[in-house]
């Protein structure tokens, strides 16, 4: 659950965000095995990160039952974590972000939300600056490392970021040139027959999504050693056990998907799911 936000917070040491996840995870684990009438009420500090940022947007306490408000908080936490600006944030909401409802906020409110996010998540914002430096290092052939990743280049504009599983993200033919339409310089790299732009927030997104995928893929391999995995979608894994082993399979999958990998031992991971005789959400 919420794996990209968790990886982004972990990669840049946004410790308050990680602690918020730990508290909400602990509450969920505590009450999950209890009948609904025996569950204690959730405290404000046990709400998830989406609800918490919803407070900022709406100026009141947001709970999971506030579906629209929490959804907007989710869009903020996921989208703004990769350097999305106010104008794009406004357009994203108006189009129906993440398949959700269309929401129209004035630009001034979007600017306030973006500023507030960056101030509250200042270590993530600093991570974008680190990523900008990584781009420049790759272009110049300068090597470096941060936590579980390392990077370098051949000195001729071809750069790469090495991931903890041995795979790499490649950025060939990096160039910095002025974008006359936008009025500022930007980095681009060759992708097939096209040139694609790359900047701090976008490289951050690439790294976070790659690391999140590695986590889920390794979890899937652990599960597949005991129960046959039949499909995966984003951060979802589906296995096909015998009916009599369904509950055991679910418990095993839950254990696998909440266990960090060796290169990120302190990241808080969470999962939710269930079993049925047919595939459903």
Q: Whereabouts are the PLM-identified features?
A:
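Conserved catalytic core of nucleotide polymerization and phosphodiester-bond processing enzymes
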Residues: 1-281
């Amino acid at each position: 659950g919420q794996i990209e936000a968790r990886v982004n917070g972990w990669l840049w040491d946004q410790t308050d965000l990680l602690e918020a996840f730990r508290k909400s995870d602990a509450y969920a684990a505590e009450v999950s095995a209890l009948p609904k009438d025996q569950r204690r009420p959730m405290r404000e500090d046990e709400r998830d990160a989406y609800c918490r940022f919803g407070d900022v947007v709406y100026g009141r306490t947001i709970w999971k039952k506030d579906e629209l408000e929490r959804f907007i908080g989710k869009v903020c936490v996921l989208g703004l974590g990769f350097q999305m600006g106010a104008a794009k944030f406004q357009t994203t909401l108006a189009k129906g972000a993440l398949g959700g409802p269309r929401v129209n906020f004035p630009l001034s409110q979007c600017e306030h939300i973006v500023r507030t996010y960056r101030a509250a998540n200042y270590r993530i914002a600093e991570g974008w600056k680190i990523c900008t430096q990584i781009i420049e290092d790759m272009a110049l052939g300068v090597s470096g490392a941060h936590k579980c990743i390392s990077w370098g280049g051949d000195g001729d504009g071809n750069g790469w970021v090495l991931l903890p599983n041995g795979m790499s993200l490649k950025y060939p033919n990096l160039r910095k040139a002025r974008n006359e339409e936008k009025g500022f310089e930007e980095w681009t790299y060759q992708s097939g027959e096209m040139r694609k732009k790359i900047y701090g927030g976008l490289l951050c997104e690439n790294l976070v999504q790659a690391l999140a995928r590695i986590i889920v893929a390794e979890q899937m391999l652990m599960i597949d050693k005991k129960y046959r995995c039949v499909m995966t979608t984003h951060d979802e894994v589906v296995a096909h056990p015998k009916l009599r082993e369904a509950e055991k399979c679910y418990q095993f999958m839950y254990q696998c998907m909440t266990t960090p990998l060796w290169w990120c031992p302190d990241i808080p991971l969470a999962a939710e799911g269930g079993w049925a005789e047919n595939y459903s959400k």
